């Protein structure tokens, strides 16, 4: 709300020199309205705004990662949030396009060793310039770590996170404990490549009622 009020109070004028990147603020007005209109999740929204300000006001460096984790159970709006984040980052020019692709284990892992790396790289290449969203990313691996296909996929993904850090935003979602044990534990380099971690809030009864009314 504060950012939207700032945009309303200060129309963009080319003959005025602002202390902040006001053009970036105006460019993200539409997706910010979408984010604001989502029911509940106040803490999550505030965290996303911190990330947006960091990148939109050029506070980041070339070696900073955009990759993000959204913790939470199914049905808490993680996919919609990821789409809005893609719109925001493409609007400010950090991402080159508004491409958004949601994938699961079946989209990344093949039936034979060696093919999984190729399949994963193809998905990464297809998403360059936009957002790759891996829902339930913990399903890529398992707690026992006996799946060699999972290791091949996750290692290839980890490589792509660095090689294309300025061209790609990877967002993964799922339960925190499962992601830690079935995804991050496969490769020690993964944790540092996902500096942004958000948690979805549990909906309150009144919020669930509003969601129901909105759908009706």
Language model: regions and residue ranges:
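Short glycine-rich substrate-engagement loop in P-loop NTPases that contacts/grips substrate
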Residues: 97-127
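A short helix-turn-beta junction within AAA+ P-loop NTPase domains corresponding to the substrate/partner-engaging
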Residues: 183-202
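Conserved AAA+ ATPase "sensor/coupling" helix adjacent to the nucleotide-binding pocket
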Residues: 186-188, 209-216
